[in-house]
């Protein structure tokens, strides 16, 4: 892999993958993309990238393969099998999976890839669509130091805070903790919003002053307008946060860590899905609190 301009294949051009791949193109990388939606392929072409008709075609000549898909089943579907990445990427290629999946899936993928001579990093991100567009994502990485060092210039084109967290699966473990913190924080903000509204306080003024003190957070900064305007257009969908809460709950159980507050929030996220809100932004946790409080939904 060239240290300056490796040839990149990108699989998965969704809400996160599209702007991230475009930022690589802006940084001077040759990017060939594959996804199932033609409009996303057209967008990549318009940004200066190349598109492929299959995973095999996309990865065959790539130095680096980057994947960004919704969950573990999708990672397994694109990685394994005769048409998958492992059977078609060249020996010596570096596979960087930036999806948010279970730590064990990442560990298993790294083991399978090693048998094919393919190196792997798990590198999930935090920062949402805005962070992807602005190239200021936090990137938490699991894998070997040498592979991280080679991938770091790519990460620097995508994010701002980039950390090697440990061996394979460590990036996913840290991402699971991130999703726990974010969900609990959004839930706390949502409860505060309902409390303030039912108390007759000027909500905008209250959130402004709260965000200037110890209660302030990146979550409140990013989601304040969602609460004020009741704008729940995703963003990061409840469906995906439900998946992530399942990951952190299972992982915590496996290591014997108690997550009492996280477990309650996970159930509230699940309740939103059953009431048809799974496609909304995760700031729609406000709707769960409102239902419990007999307030506006």
Where are these regions (language model features)?
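Hydrophobic beta-strand scaffold residues
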Residues: 31, 51, 120-121, 162, ...
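Rossmann-fold dinucleotide-binding core
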Residues: 100-180
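NAD(P)+-binding Rossmann beta1-loop-alpha1 motif at the extreme N-terminus of oxidoreductases
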Residues: 1-67, 93, 98, 129
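Rossmann-fold NAD(P) dinucleotide-binding segment
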Residues: 55-67, 71-119
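NAD(P)-dependent dehydrogenase/reductase Rossmann-like domain
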Residues: 274-297
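Interdomain hinge/lid region at the active-site interface
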Residues: 168, 216-282
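Active-site-proximal catalytic alpha-helix in oxidoreductases
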Residues: 134-135, 139-142, 163, 167-199, ...
């Amino acid at each position: 892999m060239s240290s300056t301009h490796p040839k990149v294949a990108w699989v998965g051009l969704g809400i996160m993958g599209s702007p991230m791949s475009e930022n690589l193109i802006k940084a001077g990388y040759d990017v060939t993309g594959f996804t199932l939606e033609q409009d996303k392929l057209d967008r990549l072409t318009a940004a200066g990238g190349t598109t492929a008709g299959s995973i095999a075609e996309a990865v065959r000549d790539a130095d680096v393969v980057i994947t960004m898909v919704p969950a573990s089943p999708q990672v397994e579907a694109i990685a394994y099998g005769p048409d998958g990445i492992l059977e078609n990427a060249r020996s010596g290629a570096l596979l960087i999976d930036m999806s948010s999946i279970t730590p064990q899936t990442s560990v298993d993928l790294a083991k399978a890839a090693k048998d094919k001579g393919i190196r792997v990093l798990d590198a999930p991100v935090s920062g949402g669509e805005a962070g992807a567009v602005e190239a200021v994502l936090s990137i938490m990485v699991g894998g070997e130091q040498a592979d991280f060092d080679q991938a770091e210039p790519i990460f620097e084109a995508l994010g701002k805070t980039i950390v090697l967290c440990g061996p394979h699966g460590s990036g996913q473990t840290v991402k699971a903790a991130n999703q726990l913190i974010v969900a609990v924080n959004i839930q706390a903000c949502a409860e505060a919003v309902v409390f303030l509204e039912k108390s007759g306080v000027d909500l905008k003024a209250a959130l402004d002053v709260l965000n200037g003190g110890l209660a302030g957070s990146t979550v409140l900064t990013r989601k304040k307008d969602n609460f004020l305007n009741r704008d729940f257009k995703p963003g990061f969908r409840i469906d995906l946060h439900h998946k992530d809460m399942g990951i952190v709950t299972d992982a915590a159980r496996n290591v014997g860590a108690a997550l009492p507050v996280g477990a309650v929030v996970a159930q509230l996220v699940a309740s939103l899905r059953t009431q048809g809100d799974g496609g909304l932004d995760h700031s729609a946790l406000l709707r769960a609190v409102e239902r419990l409080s007999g307030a506006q939904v």
